[in-house]
Amino acid sequence: MSTIEERVKKVVAERLNVKEEDIQNTSSFTEDLGADSLDTVELVMALEEEFDTEIPDEEAEKITTVQEAIDYVVAHQ
């Protein structure tokens, strides 16, 4: 089984069409990985599906980096 970090990075890579090796925990979805607002919505939906969880809109708005996504998933497993 992959770690949460590996799974988050895989989802990010697939959704944002970037290489996993180019994704750092500190990477910002918009500034470093080139996501626009639609990409971030789709990314949150993909994370919800991958981890079988629901991320409320007000929480989703706070998730702007890879590490924040990892932290959210860890806290809500």
Swiss-Prot record:
It is found in: Cytoplasm. Pathway: Lipid metabolism; fatty acid biosynthesis. Keywords: Cytoplasm, Fatty acid biosynthesis, Fatty acid metabolism, Lipid biosynthesis, Lipid metabolism, Phosphopantetheine, Phosphoprotein. One of its GO terms (cellular component) is cytosol. The modification O-(pantetheine 4'-phosphoryl)serine is found at residue 37. Residues 2-77 form the Carrier domain. The keyword DNA damage does not apply. 4'-phosphopantetheine is transferred from CoA to a specific serine of apo-ACP by AcpS. This modification is essential for activity because fatty acids are bound in thioester linkage to the sulfhydryl of the prosthetic group. It comes from the Bacteria. GO terms for molecular function: acyl binding; acyl carrier activity. Belongs to the acyl carrier protein (ACP) family. HAMAP family: Acyl_carrier (MF_01217). Carrier of the growing fatty acid chain in fatty acid biosynthesis. This is Acyl carrier protein.
